[in-house]
Every structure is written in structure tokens, then in C-alpha cells.
Amino acid sequence: MSSNATDLTTGFIASIVAIVLFGSNFVPLKKYETGDGMFLQWVLCAAIWLVALVVNLILHCPKFWPFAMVGGCIWATGNIAVVPIIKTIGLGLGILIWGSFNALTGWASSRFGWFGMDAEEVAKPVLNYIGAGLSVVSAFIFLFIKSEIPNNTYSVDTTPLISEHVINKTQDPDPDCSWVDKLSTAQSHLVGCSLAVISGILYGSTFVPIIYIKDHSKRNDSIYAGASQNDLDYIFAHFSGIFLTSTVYFLAYCVAMKNNPKLHPEAVLPGFLSGVLWAIATCCWFIANRSLSAVVSFPIITAGPGFIATMWGVFMFKEIQGRKNYLLMMLAFCIILTGALCTAFSKI
């Protein structure tokens, strides 16, 4: 088997694993109360950092590039909104929307060389454009899917940190009631979709520092000259940025709460498991970036988890119901699948 064929096989296998884990990593938390999500976010990020430590030791501690931490900071900032997103529009729809905008941002920045990166070329650019365009179309379809969130599961959802400390100052006196719970149905849908779009754009920018370092490593006049071309060598720095940023946010939250944070011990182990799943999925994504290039991996890996998450939302959590919603989902999935295939074949 040729080296190119091996890279393609490795890249697509890594993509499949990443898709399944990204679409399922929030599921362990669904049955548990997470409150406002701040403490849970810190637990999840601690698990992420521990996985990075193990990977770093396996790779014999490659050189640490501090600039790669910026990508982790961007991811953690985007992750602030995840708990409100899940509370307002549900697990499946939330991942579908932010995944679509994640795909578009990551694809465009790699394809056109934004933020100082080198523009990436593909064998069949027309197919690549079609694939990215279909991701955008699917995102707009998802905006019209209505989700139903049971009151008793309003916060058990997901991973990350949540509303900012400014929001915490205006919370309802009820310790279990947050600003999200006071929104009307229409407001919840608008707020959830808007936050999902913003998070998706930030998620799509998370690999920019790493790709920037790799691109400039080929230039003798750059401070990054000679830097590794193996994406996994940047895992530890990237995940350290995530953990550092989440720690800063959590400490700011504790100050805002006057050293009385809302802790939910029963969610610690599920949160840790969620973090491990996310970290493994991201490692697979790094492998896919190396084997396929970001311009190919982004549309595939960011579109797929929405399908997995929505299946959880439909069959297990009953968040999405009704014939109209099912038809819209089927249409969106067909578009996603077509877009992913176009993107994949653009590399060959």
C-alpha cells in the first residue's frame, strides 16, 4: 500500500472515531445535575489535561510551543456557552448548529490562508467548495428544527463551562434556577441558536495557532523554524491552554459567587469521563489533520457528530419530536453526508 493510501486510510479511520466520540461525549452527563456548569467545566478540563499528559509522555515530551496554548484558550472560551446551549435547544440540535459553523470557519481559514496560515490546496477544489457549501446549507436547516427540553433535565447536559460571571450576578434567588430557565420558548430558541453559532466560530478557530506554527516552521527566518509537522506534538500545549483558561474562569466565578460556588459532586465522575472521551476524540482529529489536512478533515469531523448526537436526542432523550422535525433532520443529514463525501473525494 502506498504512503498516500496509508495516510488516507489512517485519516478516515481517525475521523470516524472522532465523530463517534464527539457525538457521544456529553451523554454520560445527561442523567446528572450540573448546576450552572462552572465546576463541571473545570473537572472536564482537568480530565482533558491528564489525557494530554499521557500522550505527551508517550511521545517522549516533544518541544513545548506556548503559542499553541492560544488555541486551547479559544476553545475554552467558546465552551463557556455549552451548558446554556444544551439547556435551551438540546444536545442534538446544539451540536448540529455549532458543528456546522465550526466546519465552515475551520475550512475557510485553512482553504484561504486566514490569520497568517498558508492556503491549502486540494486535488479537486470544486468538490471541496461544494462540500463546504453544503455544510452551510445544513446549518440553516437546523435552525428551523424545534427541540423540547424536559424541565427535570434542564442542566444535566454537557461539558463545559457556562455563563459568564456577569450572568451569575443576576441569577434568580432559587439556587437551582439560572437565567436560562427564565427565558420563554421563543427566547430560548433564539438565545440557544445564537450562542451555538458563536461557539461554533470559536471552535473553528481553535487549530489556527498550531497550523500557523507548522506553516512557519518551513521558513528559516521564523521563530518557529524547525517546529514539528506532527500535530500530536502540540497536544500538550493545546490542552494546557484549555486547562489554564478554564481554571481562570472557574476562579473568577468563585470570586463572583463570593467563594460559594455551586458544586455537584455526583457529576464529577461522569464529567471526568466526558473529558476523557473529548480528549481522545481531539487526538484523533489531530491525526486526521496530519493525514488528510485541515481543509478536508474539518467538514467531515465537524458535521458527523451532529448525526450521532441527534440520534441520542431522538431515541434516548426525546428532545426532538414531530414529523416536520424528523423530515428536516433527514434532509439535513442527507446534505451533510453529500457534503462529507464531496470533501473526502476532493482529496483523492
Swiss-Prot record:
<dbReference type="InterPro" id="IPR010651">
    <property type="entry name" value="Sugar_transport"/>
</dbReference>
<keyword id="KW-0812">Transmembrane</keyword>
<feature type="transmembrane region" description="Helical">
    <location>
        <begin position="235"/>
        <end position="255"/>
    </location>
</feature>
<protein>
    <recommendedName>
        <fullName>Transmembrane protein 144</fullName>
    </recommendedName>
</protein>
<comment type="similarity">
    <text>Belongs to the TMEM144 family.</text>
</comment>
<feature type="transmembrane region" description="Helical">
    <location>
        <begin position="125"/>
        <end position="145"/>
    </location>
</feature>
<feature type="transmembrane region" description="Helical">
    <location>
        <begin position="8"/>
        <end position="28"/>
    </location>
</feature>
<feature type="transmembrane region" description="Helical">
    <location>
        <begin position="326"/>
        <end position="346"/>
    </location>
</feature>
<dbReference type="Pfam" id="PF07857">
    <property type="entry name" value="TMEM144"/>
</dbReference>
<dbReference type="GO" id="GO:0016020">
    <property type="term" value="C:membrane"/>
</dbReference>
<keyword id="KW-0472">Membrane</keyword>
<keyword id="KW-1133">Transmembrane helix</keyword>
<feature type="transmembrane region" description="Helical">
    <location>
        <begin position="193"/>
        <end position="213"/>
    </location>
</feature>
<feature type="transmembrane region" description="Helical">
    <location>
        <begin position="295"/>
        <end position="315"/>
    </location>
</feature>
<feature type="transmembrane region" description="Helical">
    <location>
        <begin position="93"/>
        <end position="115"/>
    </location>
</feature>
<feature type="transmembrane region" description="Helical">
    <location>
        <begin position="267"/>
        <end position="287"/>
    </location>
</feature>
<feature type="transmembrane region" description="Helical">
    <location>
        <begin position="39"/>
        <end position="59"/>
    </location>
</feature>
<dbReference type="GO" id="GO:0015144">
    <property type="term" value="F:carbohydrate transmembrane transporter activity"/>
</dbReference>
<dbReference type="InterPro" id="IPR012435">
    <property type="entry name" value="TMEM144"/>
</dbReference>
<feature type="transmembrane region" description="Helical">
    <location>
        <begin position="64"/>
        <end position="86"/>
    </location>
</feature>
